[in-house]
């Protein structure tokens, strides 16, 4: 309100929206999609990726089921293990180890699930002396790209784009362009140029050899085989329990925002932000264009919003990031001691060779047209996949939506340009070990000597760029 009243040129950019370390389990964009909470004049961009992970993808599972009178603990799905359910499994295993009979252990497991659910958002406290490894991969999006920790799907970017408010006549839909950022809290932006130095270039500081960082986790001998009820009235002044050891496996070197401008000055950059002619990357300097070719007034770039009386024809151009070599360029004007202080002697140091773009993924979202229209049926991810020929010249593809006019509804399109696999910090997340049925049976935490180690926790990753969407409504002849 202060910004609006003073007529200050401003942008309000939500960030880390699906990050569950700070958002409660049932967080949803529907709480903000109203005339009071959302003003598209200021809020037309969103951070889709950062050092705290990816907030892009929607999934239909939830941490709890909403039922009349409260919440209940859902069962696991193929790609999601609820924390509340795992709370029961922790107590069941502790009960088994302490020689409890099967019936007693089942009763205590059910009790633990209920205690965890009733203690929301302090459920972790219902399991006495819980250890990070006991939670396995619970609470995580297991099939998302570099996901945010404790993923909140109804706070994802895709959910926001598909959502509509049919009750508030003053509400405008979310029409977000996409940005990326580092968000590493160290005043060192753009740290994704090389996948090195986890402690310096990410928020992941955990080392199990450091007694302070390990928070004195209890040993198995103190694993009490029964959960406890939590009095929420006593939690009013208490912060939500920290999961620093697990969070460390979901922190990355961060993303970038890229802008399409004809001049490198503040005015041009500011204009591109306001017109959404920007895109996000996972940290690599990937070049990306996404245009509609056949609009009557000419080419419409990413971020555009318009109507059409014909099926849209799209073009995507993508060029991989430049490959990096160790160290800093000999042309650098800074002395060695300064370079070591600023970036540990590792600069953006490209060679004249680029990483290969492997494929283009197209995502199609059809926003809701009536109240409670199921969101999961409206997000097609991916709608199309187009493979690219390996080339130093990048990738150029065109495609059409032949069903746009027949659908007779607004459609949102955006693309991802995917690079060939390369190593990245934290890309394996919890590095689960699976049994024959595909169930996670052991985790290897980043920063843990007995897990992925205290180094950079490197694993294969497909770096990418996300275009801002185009928003198209049909105009019937």
Which residues are covered by each model-predicted region?
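C-terminal functional module detector
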Residues: 5-11, 16-477
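Short, small-residue-biased leader/transition segments that mark boundaries at the very start
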Residues: 1-3
């Amino acid at each position: 309100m202060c910004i609006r009243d003073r007529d200050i040129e401003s942008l309000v950019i939500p960030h880390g929206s699906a990050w569950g370390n700070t958002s409660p389990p049932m967080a949803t964009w529907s709480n903000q999609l109203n005339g009071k909470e959302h003003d598209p004049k200021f809020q037309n961009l969103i951070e889709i990726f950062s050092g705290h992970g990816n907030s892009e993808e929607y999934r239909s599972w939830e941490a709890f089921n909403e039922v009349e009178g409260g919440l209940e603990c859902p069962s696991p799905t193929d790609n999601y293990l609820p924390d509340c359910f795992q709370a029961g499994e922790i107590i069941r295993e502790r009960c088994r180890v302490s020689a409890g009979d099967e019936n007693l252990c089942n009763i205590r497991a059910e009790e633990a699930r209920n205690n965890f659910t009733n203690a929301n958002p302090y459920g972790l406290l219902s399991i006495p002396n819980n250890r990070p490894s006991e939670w396995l991969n619970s609470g995580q999006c297991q099939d998302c790209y570099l996901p945010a920790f404790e993923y909140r799907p109804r706070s994802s970017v895709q959910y926001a784009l598909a959502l509509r408010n049919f009750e508030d006549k003053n509400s405008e839909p979310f029409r977000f362009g996409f940005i990326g950022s580092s968000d590493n809290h160290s005043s060192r932006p753009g740290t994704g140029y090389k996948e090195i130095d986890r402690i310096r270039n990410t928020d992941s500081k955990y080392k199990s050899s450091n007694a302070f960082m390990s928070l004195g986790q209890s040993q198995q001998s103190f694993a009490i085989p029964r959960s406890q009820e939590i009095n929420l009235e006593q939690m009013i002044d208490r912060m939500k329990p920290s999961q620093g050891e697990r969070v460390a496996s979901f922190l990355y070197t961060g993303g970038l925002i890229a802008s399409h401008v004809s001049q490198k000055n503040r005015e041009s950059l500011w204009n591109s932000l306001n017109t959404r002619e920007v895109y996000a990357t996972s940290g690599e300097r990937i070049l990306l264009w996404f245009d509609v070719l056949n609009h009557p007034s000419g080419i419409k770039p990413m971020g555009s919003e318009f109507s059409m009386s014909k099926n849209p024809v799209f073009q995507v151009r993508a060029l991989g990031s430049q490959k990096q070599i160790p160290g800093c360029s000999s042309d650098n004007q800074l002395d060695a001691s300064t370079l070591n202080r600023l970036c540990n002697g590792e600069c953006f140091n490209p060679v004249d060779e680029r990483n290969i773009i492997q494929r283009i993924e197209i995502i199609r979202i059809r926003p809701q047209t009536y109240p409670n229209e199921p969101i999961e049926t409206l997000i097609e991810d991916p709608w199309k996949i187009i493979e690219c020929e390996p080339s130093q010249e990048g990738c150029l593809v065109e495609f059409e939506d032949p069903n746009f006019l027949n659908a007779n509804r607004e459609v949102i399109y955006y693309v991802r340009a995917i690079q060939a696999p390369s190593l990245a910090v934290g890309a394996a997340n919890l590095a689960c070990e699976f049994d024959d049925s595909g169930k996670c049976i052991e985790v290897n935490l980043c920063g843990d000597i007995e897990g992925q180690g205290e180094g950079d926790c490197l694993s294969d990753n497909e770096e990418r760029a996300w275009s801002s969407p185009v928003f198209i409504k049909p105009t019937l002849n």
